[in-house]
Amino acid sequence: MANETKKRRAGYYWLNEKPYVSVTNVLKVIDKAALRYWFGQQVFLAVAKDPGLNMREALAAPYRTTKKAATRGSFIHNLIENYKPNPNIDINNVPEEYKGYVDAFVKWHKDFNPKFLECEKSVFNHEHKYAGTLDVKALIGGRKVLIDFKTSKDGAVYDEAHLQLSAYCEAEGTKKAFIVGLGENGNYQHVEAQLNFDVFLAAKKIWEFKNRKQLETLGY
């Protein structure tokens, strides 16, 4: 509808002043044992590198790394969004620390030859009151699919990405999706998403229970 107003704040998307919980916020309820290990490792490495750090400085190390990863992700996603009208990327103008990820994306694009239809689209599920931003809707082999890009050192793909795309596919009425993990080494993983909307809804129920007071205040 032309008169709809969409905003995003505090872990929610707002459509005509009504809150829709973000998909990524819901998925935070899922325990991530590997993330706890990574957090401890980052603190250990920071102290090993600089034994003079105090506790607060050492505990801040993982957050600095996370901020760098977010900046990297934003750069790569912006590049992907602009690749459709301008497929001739000058690799020499890409910051050195991002070149591997860009190489991985270019390889993937050449291998699968997608036709991008929409990028960075906000999607809403009115029945279940959630929303999110999908990376790309595209045609691959003549079939409409959703694609989510992830950047990491080794291009790994984690379970939460499957649930994220399960939610997006349900909102968009799409039956197939892919996760593309872009690695720092210039390689990629192209994985078909295992769509299971029921599991996403189960996570959402838990999230709603844990945040029930906040939801009541917001009139969710």
Question: Where are the regions that the model predicts?
Answer:
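Metal-dependent nuclease catalytic cores that hydrolyze phosphodiester bonds in DNA/RNA
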Residues: 1-131, 220
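Nucleic-acid nuclease catalytic cores
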Residues: 97, 121-220
